[in-house]
């Protein structure tokens, strides 16, 4: 199985880059994994609701145009179902057992995902009801993917 993460925004903070690289390395024995970054759409300070929708639409088109028709897409959405780590592990492994050769997670920008992209997703999950920097979401998702493989393989996870 291959896992792909499509994300809006470039990681600027070194501590996040280091953490992301660490978990990419840890995941490699279990699965091929890649992160593809797309640039943030420009937005002025204190945008109006219509400007926010425009930003989400522009960012959404970048991700949407990258997807293929047969991609299995999971969007990360604050308002969708939350899974604990064991449930997340089962969720990912169920996709693998069903023969999914590629799972694509999508992470929106600061204002979230466009409606078009939400409709395109095959499923949507929430990592938490808490709000995180969207750049931090990548690290949290990678850690949970790694933890999920460790749970599935019944291996000790050295934190």
Model regions and ranges:
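N-terminal beta1-alpha1 ligand-phosphate binding loop
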Residues: 1-27
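A mid-sequence interfacial segment
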Residues: 86-128
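S-adenosyl-L-methionine/SAH cofactor-binding core of RNA-modifying enzymes
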Residues: 39-101
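Structured adenosyl-cofactor binding patch, chiefly the S-adenosyl-L-methionine
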Residues: 115-159
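General small-molecule cofactor/ligand-binding pocket signal
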Residues: 6, 34-36
């Amino acid at each position: 199985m291959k896992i792909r993460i499509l994300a809006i925004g470039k990681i600027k903070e070194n501590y996040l880059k280091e953490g992301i690289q660490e978990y990419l390395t840890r995941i490699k024995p279990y699965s091929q994994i890649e992160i593809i970054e797309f640039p943030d759409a420009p937005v002025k300070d204190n945008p109006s609701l219509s400007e926010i929708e425009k930003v989400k639409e522009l960012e959404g088109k970048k991700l949407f145009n990258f997807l293929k028709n047969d991609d299995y897409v999971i969007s990360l959405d604050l308002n969708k179902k939350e899974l604990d780590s064991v449930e997340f592990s089962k969720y990912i492994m169920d996709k693998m057992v069903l023969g999914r050769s590629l799972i694509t997670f999508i992470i929106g920008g600061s204002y979230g995902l466009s409606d078009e992209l939400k409709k395109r997703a095959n499923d949507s999950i929430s990592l938490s009801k808490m709000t995180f920097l969207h750049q931090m979401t990548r690290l949290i998702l990678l850690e949970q993917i790694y933890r999920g493989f460790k749970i599935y393989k019944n291996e000790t996870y050295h934190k």
